Amino acid sequence: MNGRALSATLVTTVLLAVASSAHAGTALNAIKERGHIKCGVSDGLPGFSHTDEKGKFSGIDVDVCRAVAAAVFGDSTKVKFTPLTAKERLTALQSGEIDVLSRNTTWTSSRDSAQGLNFTGVTYYDGQGFLVNKKLGVKSAKELDGATVCVQAGTTTELNLSDYFRANKMKYTPITYDKSDESAKALEAGRCDVLTSDQSQLYAQRIKLAKPGDYVVLPEVISKEPLGPVVRHGDDDWFDIVKWT
C-alpha cells in the first residue's frame, strides 16, 4: 500500500470512528456541543509545547491535539490549550477540566490502572538524565554523591531519582519546583548542583539558559519514559478516536 492510500485509509478509519461514536460517547457529545477540544499541555517546553511571541502554540504535544480536532471537526483550529504544571495535569484531566492531556506524560502501570486514566499510545520515547554546569567538573552521574538536585514535583522523575541514588549508595538533597522553567532557573542561579528530568526536557531547557554552552547533559540514562496522550477511563469511544488519530 502506498503512502497516499495508507493516509486515506487512516483518515477514513478515524472518521468512521467519529461517526459511530456520536451516539454513545459522552465526551465526544460534550465536545461537539461545545465546539472545541480542551487540551492540556506543558507550561513552556520547546519541541513539545511552547508559545511564540504572538502566543501561538507549537510542538509535538500541540500537534496531537490539533490532529484530534481535525478528526472530530474537520478543522485543526478547534482546540483550546491549557498550560499545566506536572502537579496539576492529572487532576485537571480527572476532574474534566480538559478532554485530553498531551503533556509529555510518562505511561506507567499505576497511572493507567489505578488513577482512572487511559493512555492512547506513545508519541515520544524518552529517558531520565542529568544536566550540570561544566564548572562542577562532573563527567558521570555516579560522581553526584552529596549533590543538591533540582527536580520537578509530581513526576516519575522524583521516584526514579530516589531509586537511582539508593541503588548506587549515594546521598542527595532534592529541591522541588512546580514548573520546569523554575527548576532550570534554579540550576542557573546555583541553587542546586544538578537538574534531573527527561533528557528531551534537559536539552530544551538548556537552550533557554543565558549561557547554554556552560552546561552539559551527563551520559547516564536512568529510566525508560514512554510519553503519550491521556484521556479519562470509561469512555471507550473517545479513547478510540484519540488513539487512532
What do the PLM-derived regions correspond to, one by one?
Residues 18-24:
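Sec/Tat signal peptide C-region and signal peptidase I cleavage site
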Residues 51-54, 66-77, 119, 157-176, ...:
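Ligand-binding cleft/hinge of the Venus flytrap
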Residues 41, 57-59, 146-154, 177:
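Short beta-strand->loop
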Residues 9-18:
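Bacterial N-terminal signal peptides
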